[in-house]
From Swiss-Prot:
Lineage: Bacteria, Bacillati, Bacillota, Bacilli, Bacillales
One Pfam family in the UniProt entry: Polysacc_deac_1
Organism field: Bacillus subtilis (strain 168)
Keyword Signal: yes
Family annotation (PANTHER family): CHITOOLIGOSACCHARIDE DEACETYLASE (PTHR10587:SF80), GLYCOSYL TRANSFERASE-RELATED (PTHR10587)
InterPro entries linked to this entry: Glyco_hydro/deAcase_b/a-brl, NODB_dom, Polysacc_deacetylase_ArnD, Spore_polysacc_deacetyl_YlxY, TonB_box_CS
Gene that this polypeptide is encoded by: ylxY
Bridged cysteine pairs (disulfide): none
Keywords noted in UniProt: Hydrolase, Signal
Biological process terms in GO annotation: carbohydrate metabolic process
Residues in NodB homology domain copies: 130-306
Record's protein name: Uncharacterized protein YlxY
Amino acid sequence: MYKKFVPFAVFLFLFFVSFEMMENPHALDYIGAMKKDTVTVTASKDPLYEELLQKAPEYEVKPQNARIDKVWKSIPGYNGLKVNIEQSYKKMKQHGKFREKDLVYSQVKPSVHLESLQPEPIYKGNPDKPMVAFLINVAWGNEYLEKMLPILQKHQVKATFFLEGNWVRNNVQLAKKIAKDGHEIGNHSYNHPDMSKLTTGRISEQLDKTNEQIEQTIGVKPKWFAPPSGSFRKAVIDIAAEKQMGTVMWTVDTIDWQKPAPSVLQTRVLSKIHNGAMILMHPTDPTAESLEALITQIKDKGYALGTVTELMDETRLLK
């Protein structure tokens, strides 16, 4: 009788324990934590785990806060790196030794971000980020745009197109085509005035009218503004910021409006390329003729190509 009762009692005990676990999710959390702690304790006795703990600080990179530079004004932050001990150990355990290529990283965000800085123009991305961006200002040159768009698409490059509001109004289908291809759309004023000479009311009107035209036509609200000819004063920066737009300048100029030979344009750009470069161009014949070579050679130099938003993003690019 006793022998028959023992299995039944064990069954009842297990049943009530299981029921309690289902009723109490904290019990499951506790068991999970216990298992993890057990694994960690076991790993901590492994010389490989100890070696990993000792070497990990050598591979960590501190995050960089966004800042205002005396020369380059607003500079975006850049994520740091911290070794994920558990994931790295799991990979190394398969080979039984420390291997640098098995390190797994977690990204660490900076504490100061670009959007928290006082409004200043943005000339380039973070100097440690191996990415560059094409800034394509559009107020004319449709025939060259139609040559450039297929090249960008072929090489899977997304650029930031700064569109003049009046141009959008007169070129609805081409404006939609640019957006449909996945490019970022920015504000380039409504009719290309010298923004530095406008009253605050006229500055606001130029920005609002262009944003309204772009939103009405394409359905997106620009987050970046490029002043025509790069001409601005502090009020332009401040008013754009009030409208949730950053003011974008450049560090590399194709000077394509002077119609240089394609070889001259390419040398000009490639000799000045750098981490975080923002490359100004327009839809012109020399740019259309140079674009494919520029993309190929920029990539060959180890740079990624992205939009202004991607360039400003704090995410660290990993090889």
